[in-house]
Amino acid sequence: MQVPKNDVYTVSRLNGEVRQLLEGQLGRIWLTGEISNFSSPSSGHWYLTLKDSHSQLRCAMFKGRNTTVAFKPINGQQVLVRGSISVYEPRGDYQLLIEAMFPAGDGLLAAQFEALKMKLAAEGLFAQDTKRPLPESIQRIGVITSPTGAAIRDVLHVLKRRDPSVEVVIYPTAVQGTGADKDIIRAIELANQRLEVDVLLLTRGGGSLEDLWCFNSEALAHAIYNSTLTIVSAVGHEVDTSIADFVADVRAPTPSAGAELLSGDQSHKQQKLAGALARLTQGWRHYALKRHSGLISLQSRLDRQDPKRQLQQQSQRLDELELRLTSSIQRRLSSHTLTTERLKARLERHSPAQRLMMEQQRLTYLDERLKGAMEDRLEDAQTHLGGLSHSLASVSPLATLSRGYSITRDAGGRVLTQASSMKTGDTIETQLEQGSLLARVIEIKPE
């Protein structure tokens, strides 16, 4: 049988292509599981296994990433992690490289929120061109909220102060707890059936992510999107953001701000200004969402090509060698100690007192030499490991930055090697050991 040379893989080539395939196809993922086999060697990296009732997966979280974790992981703890699948090529093992870790609970809600936001954005529910404008003239406002909460009091107070002529129709609903999202959906559908108001204000006061969870319902998002009436979302405090905020035609940071947005102070000019500001805010949110998605994609590409990945692989290998060396030395020391004890016992059984004393002195001398030899061996091994670590650091492309060199890239992030590839007026970025410089080309000098 003739085997084509180009079809024969080496083990290293196969492991490398499997790593590229996994990293390119899966990208970043969220994963939940129970911690086991947690270890933290002297390098500062974390190694652990995440498991459930049927499967387990090896994981690594390198120093620099794990410093952002607000708690110390322990075996048996349920966690939620974000990371990327990779292959540890020396062994051919696939593993998860963890970037962020949270205790199971709030972290799971946050992950569900991000997943739903990405899904609805892909479906077009956040698209700016589908937003309904605020009416030119607002005479009657429908308020969807709890009739006994602080939000309705704030809204009524602002409307009375700014424009007492505006009428208010309250659609009472639950705004927290199981089934609250269904109540809100029914209120939106009722208002669209009656068509008795010019605009709807969906609002409630602030609270935790769990308190506001009913506003992150996929069904509610579609109800807001399908509404004939313009909907203004004013949920929580300024720092709170919900799915309803992204789908609504206009988002106000607080209930009071929503009321101010819909009240005109008797001025048509202010109404137009408020509408323009609201559209600008939505446009910025849409732009920021697109930029965020682009940055995530770029970060994933950088992670796959980052030379730090090779350093991490070598650092992980050094950790394994350190553990194996320590274990080997301990086994040899235990073996020699056991042999010494056996010889001592034989001498005690068969030798007279004087011979026993001489042999005991000899054994003591041999024991000291043995310990000295083992200590010398351990010191040599540690020196060798230090040399390997120093050699690894010296070949890092980033090490040249500490010697005064720099790396210059064009606006697209490509490394520049020829001045002729740029034009006068182009923007370039120069990376130094600490920080970077953004500059513009004013003159190009040939070689």
Curated annotation (Swiss-Prot):
**Protein's name in the database:** Exodeoxyribonuclease 7 large subunit
Keywords in UniProt for this one?
Answer: Cytoplasm, Exonuclease, Hydrolase, Nuclease
Reaction it catalyzes: Exonucleolytic cleavage in either 5'- to 3'- or 3'- to 5'-direction to yield nucleoside 5'-phosphates
Q: Which GO terms describe its molecular function?
A: exodeoxyribonuclease VII activity; nucleic acid binding
Question: In which family does this protein belong, per the annotation?
Answer: Belongs to the XseA family.
Please report the organism this UniProt entry assigns to the protein.
Shewanella amazonensis (strain ATCC BAA-1098 / SB2B)
Which GO BP annotation is one of this protein's? DNA catabolic process
What is one term from the GO cellular component aspect held by the record?
Answer: cytoplasm
Compartment annotation = Cytoplasm
Subunit info here reads: Heterooligomer composed of large and small subunits.
Q: What is its EC number?
A: 3.1.11.6
Instruction: Determine if Hydrolase is one of this entry's keywords.
Output: yes
Quote the function comment for this protein: Bidirectionally degrades single-stranded DNA into large acid-insoluble oligonucleotides, which are then degraded further into small acid-soluble oligonucleotides.
Read off the InterPro entries from this record: Exonuc_VII_L, Exonuc_VII_lsu_C, OB-fold_nuc-bd_dom
Extract the HAMAP family matched here.
Answer: Exonuc_7_L
- Report the enzyme's class at the first EC level: hydrolase
